[in-house]
Structure formats: C-alpha cells, structure tokens
C-alpha cells in the first residue's frame, strides 16, 4: 500500500510517502513569515500548501499514485481517538471551525488530492480534538466553563505506542501520564 502523509503546521508542511512501512520520501517544507503573511486567514493557505505538496512529490520523482492519503486532523468537534475516513461532515466541520490553525488544512488537502485518484481514500488520525476524558476530569472551577480537550493526540499516542513496543507491552496495558 502506498501512502502519502501530510502534516500542516504553523510554519511548515511535513510530508512523507510510504510503501507499506518503507519510507520513500520524508520532507519538511518550511514557510517563512513573509510567505504566510500574504494570506489573511490560515484557511486561505489551502491552495498554496496543496501545490507545495504536489511540487515536492514531482521534485523528488514520486509518481502521483497512492492508495491512501492521510492528513493531519484538524480542530473538529471532539471525537474519540482513532483513524477516520474524511467525509462531507468532517469537511463541513472544518469549514466552520471555531478555531483557526494550519492543522485544519490536513483533511482538506488529503481529500482534494485523494479525489484526483481512482480508488484512493483520504483519512485523518488522532486529531488534536481527541476527547476521551473521564467525566471527573471535565470539572473546572465553574460550571459555566467546561473543560475542552485540545492536545497533540497524534504525537503523544505515537510516543506511547513506541514506548510500549520497547517494553514489548501493548500500550492499552500501560498507565502513562501525557504532559
């Protein structure tokens, strides 16, 4: 399976191409403040970043042939952790997102690029809005201010899985504190 992964961040767009588990390309495309200042809103960077991904693939001789394209999950409505296929409801949620961040571009770019390839599907994994809090963790000093979870779920879950693999333990069997 050939996969393109796209991770838009505040000042860069990271991409990687994998054939199964073998990396074929890992690239960090940096964006200067000057480049990004031309865009009034983060969402306006969509075409710019999408085109940079396509250019990077061409420059590195990677044919535009993928089975799946994975974008960094955006600031959607809260959902449990996992891998999700990009759908119309998700795209609409991002279009009307309460918060603006470059990560919102991930599923948009993945969906648009996947639509160009027959049989290719677009996904996100463990977006920053993963919400698996126990009810007691939602308690704040005021019922008027409910706790909202926004965290780097993708990174922290990956580190937990890596650590569990080093211990030859399944990560659900571990009790870890993410800081």
What do these predicted regions represent?
Residues 3-44:
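Short glycine-rich, Thr/Ser-proximal phosphate-binding strand/loop in the N-terminal lobe
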Residues 68-71, 121-127, 170, 174-175:
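General beta-strand structural signal in soluble alpha/beta enzymes
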Residues 108-123:
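A structural motif corresponding to the C-terminal end of an alpha-helix
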Residues 105-106, 151-170:
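Active-site glycine-rich loop that binds ribose-phosphate moieties when present
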Residues 1, 64, 119-120:
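A structural micro-motif
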Residues 48-60, 159:
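Short, well-ordered amphipathic alpha-helical segments that serve as non-catalytic structural scaffolds
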Residues 177-179:
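Conserved small/polar residues in nucleotide/adenosyl-binding loops
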Residues 57-102, 129-144:
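Short beta-strand-loop/turn "lid" adjacent to the catalytic site in phosphate-handling enzymes
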């Amino acid at each position: 399976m050939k996969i393109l992964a796209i991770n838009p961040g505040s000042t860069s767009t990271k991409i990687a191409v994998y054939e199964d588990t073998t990396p074929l390309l890992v690239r960090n495309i940096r964006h200067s403040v000057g480049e990004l200042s031309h865009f009034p809103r983060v969402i306006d960077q969509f075409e710019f970043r999408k085109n940079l991904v396509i250019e990077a693939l061409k420059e590195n001789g990677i044919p535009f042939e993928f089975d799946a394209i994975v974008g960094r999950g955006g600031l959607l409505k809260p959902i449990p952790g996992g891998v999700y296929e990009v759908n119309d409801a998700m795209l609409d949620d991002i279009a009307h997102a309460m918060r603006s961040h470059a990560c919102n571009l991930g599923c948009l770019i993945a969906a648009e690029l996947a639509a160009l390839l027959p049989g290719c599907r677009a996904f996100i994994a463990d977006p920053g809005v993963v919400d698996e809090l126990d009810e007691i963790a939602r308690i704040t000093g005021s019922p008027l201010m409910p706790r909202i979870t926004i965290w780097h779920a993708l990174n922290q879950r990956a580190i937990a899985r890596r650590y569990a693999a080093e211990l030859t333990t399944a990560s659900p069997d571990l009790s870890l504190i993410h800081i």
